[in-house]
């Protein structure tokens, strides 16, 4: 179990030393709270989190809402609605019955409880989730570019993009940044950071090789607008 300096964000490592990101942790928590603890409620996640959350919520009949990036938007839901879990890509997660804010230590304890009660390894529990939503990989590139180039990329995104190299856009969203959906459940998000002078490019696909290819193609495309 790993947290950041003030312990509001969480990361995990499995028995082989592989890093388990926040997307997988969110999925594990939903799976545990619903299947094993019979809890209910809405799931609220930020725009940059995995699309697999929607699949898991649909599987369990849970309502889901997507917010702009920033935990304050998730907290608003927690304070006003019956929220089972709220989570963001950076590792901040909150669950029902605790505080309406991120707590990495508490999330770690819940995961350990999950492992202890089932007698299963983290890898085995993740496989349970994969059996429902399918395996996936997620990654992000932070592009340190000039403000002029960054604004140029965002302007091009606003105009509309139909393809990134060989990846044809099926549909797009602009809740917070610009998200592009492709075939085979692949997607890409381009967003200017709200805390650093960078342009972030997020991607999700079936495996790491596919994610790397999508990120490479997207990065080359935006840098040549």
Q: What spans do the regions from the language model cover?
A:
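Phosphate-binding and adjacent anionic-ligand microenvironments
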Residues: 36-225
